[in-house]
């Protein structure tokens, strides 16, 4: 898409963030990217949440974040959102609100190509993080559990209005 002159955002939401390597970013470039979820000051600024305040904005300003905090390589702008990193760390609601709003802004309010690398499983579907997507590509491995997860992803994605759910197999011998 980038070669066609379209604006492309690649958003890494997987806790095992390695989308940048797959897209040709160097390790040095990736080390210079701070995941949005680790930007405490930005999250406090935008959501109004801090340790002394249990209330926060559920619709923070995020439209400038992809350009400001993303890193570009070969016409693709990478944004690393990050995830929860410590057990028992308390509520991460403000961080989750920010991440959902950033994805929502990219998908629903722009005419760009957006590719999300999400964590395997169903949690992001339950949170509605992927609402507004046109298509899902679900990677499965051989085995009944993986196929069952695909069926659940397909059902939940359809409930969110995703038009196409495709499947790609991995680790299969033909």
Predicted regions span which residues?
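Phosphate-binding/switch loop-helix module in NTP-utilizing enzymes
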Residues: 51-122
């Amino acid at each position: 898409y980038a070669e066609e002159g379209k604006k492309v955002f690649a958003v890494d939401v997987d806790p095992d963030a390695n989308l940048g390597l797959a897209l040709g970013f160097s390790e040095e470039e990736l080390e210079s990217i701070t995941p949005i979820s680790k930007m405490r000051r930005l999250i406090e600024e935008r959501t109004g949440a801090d340790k002394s305040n249990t209330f926060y904005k559920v619709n923070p300003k995020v439209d400038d974040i992809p350009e400001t905090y993303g890193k570009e390589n070969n016409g693709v702008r990478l944004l690393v959102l990050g995830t929860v990193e410590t057990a028992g760390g308390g509520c991460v609601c403000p961080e989750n609100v920010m991440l959902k709003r950033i994805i929502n802004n990219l998908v629903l309010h722009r005419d760009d190509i957006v590719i999300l690398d999400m964590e395997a499983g169903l949690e992001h579907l339950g949170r509605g993080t992927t609402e507004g997507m046109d298509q899902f590509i679900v990677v499965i491995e051989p085995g009944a559990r993986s196929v069952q997860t695909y069926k659940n992803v397909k059902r939940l994605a359809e409930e969110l209005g995703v038009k196409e759910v495709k499947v790609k197999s991995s680790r299969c011998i033909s």
